Design a protein with these regions (language model features):
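Hydrophobic packing and interface segments
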Residues: 1-324
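Short linear regulatory motifs and low-complexity interaction segments
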Residues: 317-346
Length: 346
């Protein structure tokens, strides 16, 4: 039930988050068009310093707890660091929420720039190729998350095998007399972090290029929309589920009342919470935060190849509060360095 409850918490957490930044997008657009959306995205990014401070709090408290345990300090020291670590998990989830909201706003601003550069009127989902690419885009964050979590599993198993090898071959480790080979474990995690991200990176960069070249500008716009919507949902879900599982495990240090009975560390309920935390760590630390990068990078790659896909005989620039209303510009005088345009009546 711990796994089920954690999944439910993450899924429910998407509701309020999506409602809030959907309202932010809509109000910014109604007030100032896509310029307002761009300013909103800039304002969200202006909180970067605060986000970094919030995100740094959790790892500092977690490391303090690890140092306290390895130093065999008094139990109350570990209890205090666990409380701080629980707060750190919550603040980290808040910081990640800011990051994914800014990614969504940035993606919308980049989406508007993409439509302008390609010269298309909009994204018509009644077209079969556009709808197909919308579904493909929605699938990409799911596959990306799977690859990221699979990488964590592979690296973890390699680490476990290395630790077992050291226990077998280096005498006195368990008694505290032998010196473990720490560098080997660090080497395994570092190599896995670099090597296992090659495939997700290729998936992120190459897929929008292939969609654009083989299907065109409008289906690529549908693909971008699918990645953005699906990526935001998965990011919120995974960040909050992972944080809930981690905090559930830490709460057993002080004791948790379940069905009128106090459960402590080492109980069956605590073992279930440890299992949940094993699932939650790759959720909140690996695949969840990576959705932010996936969304932004997809939109940026699409924007880079937009001039190749677009038809620039007529350049359209959205100037009103409604995206459907565009003003056409035609070249009136052309020189080597300067283009002079005149407005054409609709």
């Amino acid at each position: 039930t711990n796994i089920i409850a954690g999944l439910a918490v993450g899924m429910k957490s998407t509701f309020l988050s999506v409602i809030l930044f959907s309202a932010a997008i809509f109000s910014a657009y109604e007030l100032a068009g896509f310029y307002g959306v761009a300013i909103s995205a800039s304002a969200m990014m202006a909180t970067t310093a605060m986000q970094l401070a919030i995100d740094a709090f959790g790892p500092i408290a977690d490391n303090a707890g690890g140092v306290a345990e390895m130093s065999e300090l008094e139990p109350e020291v570990r209890e205090r660091t666990d409380i701080l670590d629980s707060v750190g998990n919550t603040t980290a989830a808040v910081g990640k929420g800011f990051a994914i909201a800014s990614a969504a706003l940035t993606a919308l601003a980049l989406f508007a720039a993409y439509v302008t550069f390609t010269g298309i009127d909009g994204i018509n989902i009644f077209k079969a190729d556009v709808l197909a690419m919308l579904f493909v885009g929605g699938m990409i964050p799911v596959v990306f998350s799977a690859l990221a979590m699979q990488s964590v599993g592979k690296a973890a198993m390699e680490m476990v095998e290395e630790v077992r090898r050291q226990f077998r071959e280096i005498p006195g480790i368990l008694e505290g007399k032998g010196k473990p080979e720490y560098a080997k474990c660090v080497d395994i995690s570092t190599k896995a972090a670099l090597k296992e991200m090659v495939l997700p990176g290729i998936l992120t960069i190459v897929t929008p290029i292939l969609v654009g070249l083989f299907f065109g500008a409008e289906p690529l716009g549908g693909y971008m929309a699918g990645v953005c919507v699906s990526g935001v949902m998965w990011a919120i879900f995974q960040n909050n589920s992972g944080g809930a599982w981690d905090n559930a495990k830490k709460s057993f240090e002080a004791g948790v009342e379940i069905n009128g009975k106090m459960e402590f560390k080492g109980s069956e309920a605590h073992k279930a919470a440890v299992t949940g935390d094993t699932v939650g760590d790759p959720f909140k630390d690996t695949s969840g935060p990576s959705m932010n990068i996936l969304i932004k990078l997809t939109c940026l790659v699409a924007l880079v190849i937009a001039p190749i896909l677009g038809d620039h005989d007529d350049i359209k620039i959205s100037v009103s509060e409604k995206i459907e209303k565009n003003i056409k510009l035609k070249i009136e005088k052309e020189s080597d360095l300067v283009h002079i345009y005149r407005f054409e009546e609709q």
